[in-house]
Amino acid sequence: LLLGQFIAKCILPVWYKEIKIDGCDSCAILIDTFGQVQMRKLAALMTIMIRTAYQTAGVQLPVETVDLIVNKSLENLRVIDCCNNDQLHLSLYALEDELLSDEKIALLAIDNILAYYWQMRREKRILGMDQYARSLVRIIRARISQFCNMTVYTRWDESMSQNETPVTSLNSPKRTDLLEEMGVNYRLQLCKSFIVREFICRVQSINDTKQIRYTISDSGIKWIL
């Protein structure tokens, strides 16, 4: 859901006929490693964001106009489907030419960067999820990051599979060192809260760790600041 909000904000327009939509009017590339991207859900999220913007401005918007904005914005999104580790690597290497030819591409999103970890663990004896993720992030940093404003990827938490508590993992020196080594600016870990209908986002940078509460609704994630 959060990844969808990043994409929606990126590809929606900043303004539409004097109404502030609060998008970025940029292009995004989504690498789908699981084949689970649902464009219908992304379109529904964008629809709610547009309607909310118009309601805030006190303006009624015809359904046809909403659909027009959504469909036009979706033209700014390219989805790349991958089926295995080789295809993922080829896609990352091929993106450099595309980014050079289109300056509007501001976001690269990958869901999920660890999709083929188990395949590579069997074939090449890669032991750790962090080790595998690090190899892909190196490619992104070397060939893509200089042309793209933001790279966002989802991943499983290795500590969760080892029955470690998320808080311990998040605040550990090992995790902080890993952020610095991989060149990751922020690590977001989403988890449930003890409060009904509330969730917690743990945000870690190299120098700081904090928690932000949030709720989930049809309009996406709402931060409780």
Listing of model-derived features with the role each one plays in the protein:
Residues 1-93:
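Conserved P-loop
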Residues 27, 75-76, 103-107, 145-155:
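Loop/turn-to-beta-strand initiation segments
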Residues 14-23, 69-72, 98-102, 142-147, ...:
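Conserved catalytic network of the ASCE P-loop NTPase/AAA+ motor domain
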Residues 44-49, 98, 204-207:
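Conserved AAA+ ATPase "sensor/coupling" helix adjacent to the nucleotide-binding pocket
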Residues 41, 89-90, 119-121, 162-166, ...:
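Short, well-ordered secondary-structure micro-motifs
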Residues 130-134, 138-225:
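Phosphate-binding/switch region of NTP-binding enzymes
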Residues 79-146:
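Phosphate-binding/switch loop-helix module in NTP-utilizing enzymes
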Residues 34-38, 83-88, 114-115, 157-161, ...:
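Conserved nucleotide-binding/hydrolysis micro-motifs of P-loop NTPases
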